[in-house]
């Protein structure tokens, strides 16, 4: 090959090498707790920010923080908490999803030095400061569980949308004010009301501009991943996070320990061998089911049933979402022979009757559960009742056994 030919081929070779590297890396960019830093992960299950985490721990030690107890979670896998000491005060390093780093500081601890030393590496949360903007509505039950309703100052939903009576009453009495939905918050109301923290669900990741705006206004943002846990007790353990944040640690830990024992008792319920399909229908009658590793299938198993889609996974390997969209044809192949159907109505509302269900799609009429009259829908408050998981499982066991549910499920006639 001539020198001239080699010179012309080099750019193409270089571009091919770059393309190959990018293809093999399969990198995705995920935000850390700060506003500018990013970490990279090769696979969705890979450890996120491991090297950065080690550097952070080393930096904490260098800056005079003495590491104490790391709490051993009983079931939860999406958060960790470690105690630290500085100036005689106890602080808590909360790590969520391996890359969101929060330092929870006592109300009387000066955070100026920490903010200067760590910048975007840590999100600072002042413990028990109140005026929390709760935009992750499923977490309301955790505040109820640890007696921390008074720490909520703002809500992303209106009183009528709360199933938790204490929150509904607090909003009616103007103790908690509506401050806009998570995707369009009332920034002026939040700043005027001195919001101390925004607690968001992972939906905020679809509106990154909102998160950035809150941070620029000086409102720290914490993203909750409790619904990504694979068992009800793991999801319930997140009450500890909210107990620490609000200064109600003892109440939270005591509540979890008591409820965990109740769930352990529930695990002894009789196994029936009956199959259960748990799903929802959107406005276009598309079917949404839970992946086999989600906490809902785990609850069905504890209730004595067998989940109809135990091996189902999200086809998007980059997604952590526990929900999977199915074509009706694919859903029908499995669901037509299931013994029991449970329809999640927390988003789209009540189906009302079997005839209304079959009107949505005539193929429902050919399904065993429909023919046998074993179709149920969830109550509106089930999504906001993570702190009552043991009661939900017991209620689920009742309907699997052919008995009437006490609260959380209603048979369609």
Residues covered by each model-derived region:
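Short helix-initiation/N-cap motifs at beta->coil->alpha
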Residues: 176-188, 313-329
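Structured C-terminal subdomain patch of bacterial secreted/periplasmic proteins
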Residues: 48-53, 229-258, 337-413
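His/Asp/Glu-enriched short active-site or ligand-binding loop at hydrolase and phosphoryl-transfer sites
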Residues: 296-320, 342-345
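A short, structured surface patch at a secondary-structure boundary
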Residues: 92-193, 197-204
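C-terminal motif of bacterial Sec signal peptides marking the signal peptidase cleavage site
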Residues: 24-26
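Basic- and aromatic-lined ligand-binding clefts that recognize polyanionic substrates
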Residues: 131-144, 245, 249-305
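Bacterial lipoprotein signal-peptidase II cleavage site
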Residues: 28-36
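Short Lys/Arg-enriched alpha/beta "domain-start" segment
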Residues: 36-72
């Amino acid at each position: 090959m001539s020198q001239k030919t080699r010179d012309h081929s080099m750019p193409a070779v270089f571009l091919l090498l770059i393309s190959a590297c990018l293809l093999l890396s399969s990198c995705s960019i995920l935000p850390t707790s700060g506003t500018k830093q990013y970490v990279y992960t090769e696979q969705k299950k890979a450890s996120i920010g491991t090297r950065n985490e080690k550097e952070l721990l080393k930096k904490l030690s260098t800056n005079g923080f003495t590491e104490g107890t790391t709490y051993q979670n009983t079931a939860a896998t999406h958060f960790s908490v470690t105690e630290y000491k500085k100036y005689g005060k106890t602080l808590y390093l909360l790590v969520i999803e391996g890359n969101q780093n929060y330092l929870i500081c006592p109300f009387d601890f000066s955070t100026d030095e920490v903010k200067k030393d760590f910048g975007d590496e840590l999100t600072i949360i002042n413990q028990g400061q109140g005026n929390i903007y709760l935009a992750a509505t499923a977490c309301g039950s955790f505040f109820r569980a640890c007696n921390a309703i008074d720490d909520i100052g703002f809500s992303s939903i209106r009183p009528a949308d709360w199933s938790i009576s204490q929150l509904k009453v607090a909003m009616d009495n103007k103790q908690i004010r509506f401050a806009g939905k998570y995707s369009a918050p009332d920034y002026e109301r939040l700043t005027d009301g001195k919001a101390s923290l925004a607690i968001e669900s992972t939906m905020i990741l679809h509106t990154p501009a909102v998160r950035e705006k809150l941070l620029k206004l000086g409102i720290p943002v914490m993203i909750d991943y409790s619904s990504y846990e694979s068992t009800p007790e793991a999801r319930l353990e997140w009450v500890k996070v909210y107990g620490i944040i609000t200064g109600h640690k003892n109440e939270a830990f005591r509540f979890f320990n008591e409820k965990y024992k109740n769930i352990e008792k529930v695990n002894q319920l009789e196994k029936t061998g009956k199959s259960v399909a748990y799903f929802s229908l959107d406005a276009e009658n598309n079917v949404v089911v839970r992946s086999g590793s989600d906490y809902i299938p785990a609850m069905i198993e504890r209730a004595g049933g067998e989940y109809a889609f135990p091996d189902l996974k999200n086809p998007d390997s980059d997604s952590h979402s526990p929900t999977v969209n199915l074509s009706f044809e694919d859903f029908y192949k499995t669901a037509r022979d299931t013994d029991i159907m449970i329809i999640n109505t927390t988003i789209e509302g009540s189906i009302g009757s079997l005839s209304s269900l079959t009107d949505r799609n005539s193929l429902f009429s050919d399904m065993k559960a429909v023919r046998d009259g074993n179709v149920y829908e969830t109550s509106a408050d089930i999504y906001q009742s993570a702190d009552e998981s043991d009661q939900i499982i017991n209620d689920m066991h009742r309907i699997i056994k052919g008995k009437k549910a006490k609260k959380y499920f209603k048979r369609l006639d």
